[in-house]
Regions:
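Coiled-coil/CHCH-like alpha-helical segments characteristic
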Residues: 1-226
Length: 226
């Protein structure tokens, strides 16, 4: 069995030598190719007799040499990832400061939504980060956004309730003069425009319901003209 695996190990050694002589132009593909060869070598260790010491030392030395061509790339990538983490910490700090400055009197939900969108785009610019930093940064980032998201939810709930009240008021319009009914509806429409967003889930549906509630006035107007 050990004799049968020797040619396979020799083949893997040849493959590593080829990578040293002709490194792949994409450092990530080059790294994956080395990983793949190392994986095959380990598979031979588990399925048959281990390599001889000299064969293992030769393979190990060659794989280390094969790494050289993409080492610089990975070192550069590591620096970029470390810097990205620094920048992301700054963004978290920036959001925390925004919360401190605004939590006594929050801007409108529209302003807050745009602010979070802007910060998210900024956050996305600083990817990737090191695996060891990823979860901690995510936790801190979501924690910093939470007070703003809570403020948006609270405002949208109030806006939803106010819009529902206006729909009820439209339903209550019941004047004999249809023109007065339309004037009253337009007055409520002006009030509606001043209310902020009720949230993506409800806003369009509420607007549609609001207008449908007034359809009866405009149908009557059309009939009067006809």
């Amino acid at each position: 069995s050990s004799f049968a695996t020797n040619p396979k190990r020799d083949e893997l050694i040849t493959n590593v030598k080829n990578l040293i002589d002709k490194p792949l132009s994409d450092p990530r593909k080059h790294a994956r190719a080395i990983h793949n060869i190392q994986g095959q070598w380990q598979l031979l260790d588990t399925s048959s007799k281990s390599a001889s010491k000299s064969q293992w030392l030769n393979f190990n030395e060659l794989t280390n040499k094969a790494w050289e061509s993409c080492k610089e790339y990975f070192e550069e990538m590591k620096e970029i990832k470390i810097n990205n983490a620094r920048e992301r910490h700054k963004i978290i700090e920036e959001i925390n400061n925004y919360v401190m400055e605004n939590q006594k009197k929050w801007p409108s939900s529209k302003v807050l939504v745009l602010y979070l969108k802007k910060m998210y785009e900024k956050w996305q610019n600083f990817a990737p980060v090191l695996d060891k930093d990823l979860n901690n940064l995510k936790t801190l980032y979501f924690a910093s956004r939470k007070p703003i998201n809570d403020a948006i939810t609270k405002q949208e709930k109030i806006n939803k309730e106010n819009k529902e009240l206006l729909i009820l008021k439209v339903n209550e319009i019941n004047d004999d003069d249809n023109k007065i009914c339309i004037d009253k509806f337009n007055e409520l429409k002006n009030q509606w425009q001043k209310i902020g967003n009720a949230g993506r889930k409800y806003d369009n549906a509420l607007w549609s319901k609001f207008n449908k509630s007034a359809d009866r006035f405009f149908i009557e107007k059309k009939q009067a003209i006809a």
